[in-house]
Amino acid sequence: MKKILLTVSLGLALSACATQGTADKDAQITQDWSVEKLYAEAQDELNSSNYTRAVKLYEILESRFPTSRHARQSQLDTAYAYYKDDEKDKALAAIERFRRLHPQHPNMDYALYLRGLVLFNEDQSFLNKLASQDWSDRDPKANREAYQAFAELVQRFPNSKYAADATARMVKLVDALGGNEMSVARYYMKRGAYIAAANRAKKIIGSYQNTRYVEESLAILELAYKKLDKPQLAADTRRVLETNFPKSPFLTHAWQPDDMPWWRYWH
């Protein structure tokens, strides 16, 4: 056991030494570089997808030229490098640091846009990919945070070059948030928790009126009211369904769990 621990410890030590050695080497190589040369080299590494080295060069630049405009831009570029390298937490931390240090920076719109992208492009599970990346199965917290980032961008910087794309992504995120609620409503219906299902359906109808889930929400709500022995409410809901979705298949047959795609049973 001691031999194993010694081997592991030695391996970790060697790894740490190698990392430190690389950092020291970068510091030595760049010691006479101007801020412009440092930034240009870091950009070359970033554009070549050498994200780890790009971050190292940005860090060296910021430590040597902390008051330069390149240092401020390097903070944003560091966040982008982490984002491209699938280092979500580091990217978000770098963005928050930039926002805290430079609340009035002219590139704040980009910082908000990048924060939204990091959250928006979170890795998908196998089932999501299998179902053509149905965003309703994403973590609703990530969806909400991404939406808030894009919304802040659009509200604060309506003329930003990123505003149009942010708005389009917000539409998709609203649909996803409605889908999250629908997944829960379906689950409650399947389990016979009709009050809870009705509440979720009403939330979709009230808060996500422009999503593709309203039609099914009305069908779930109608059936839930029937199961709860509330015929008048069920009839009222059906009239709303008929008015807004006159060709709905739910008008000829009531909602049932079999209407759910097979993969949702594992959600």
UniProtKB/Swiss-Prot annotation:
TM spans (from-to): none
CDD domains named among the record's database cross-references: BamD
GO cellular component: Bam protein complex
Annotated signal sequence range: 1-16
Pfam families reported for this sequence: YfiO
Gene Ontology process terms (BP): establishment of competence for transformation; Gram-negative-bacterium-type cell outer membrane assembly; protein insertion into membrane
Keyword match Membrane: yes
Lipid tethering residues (N-palmitoyl cysteine): C17
Keywords: Cell outer membrane, Competence, Lipoprotein, Membrane, Palmitate, Signal
Positions of S-diacylglycerol cysteine lipidation: C17
PANTHER family membership: OUTER MEMBRANE PROTEIN ASSEMBLY FACTOR BAMD (PTHR37423:SF1), SOLUBLE LYTIC MUREIN TRANSGLYCOSYLASE-RELATED (PTHR37423)
Listed NCBIfam families: OM_YfiO
Function per UniProt: Part of the outer membrane protein assembly complex, which is involved in assembly and insertion of beta-barrel proteins into the outer membrane. Required for efficient transformation of Neisseria gonorrhoeae by species-related DNA.
Description of how the protein assembles with itself and partners: Part of the Bam complex.
Assigned protein family: Belongs to the BamD family.
Name listed for the protein in its UniProt record: Outer membrane protein assembly factor BamD
The species this protein was found in: Neisseria gonorrhoeae
Biological classification of the source: Bacteria, Pseudomonadati, Pseudomonadota, Betaproteobacteria, Neisseriales
Gene: bamD
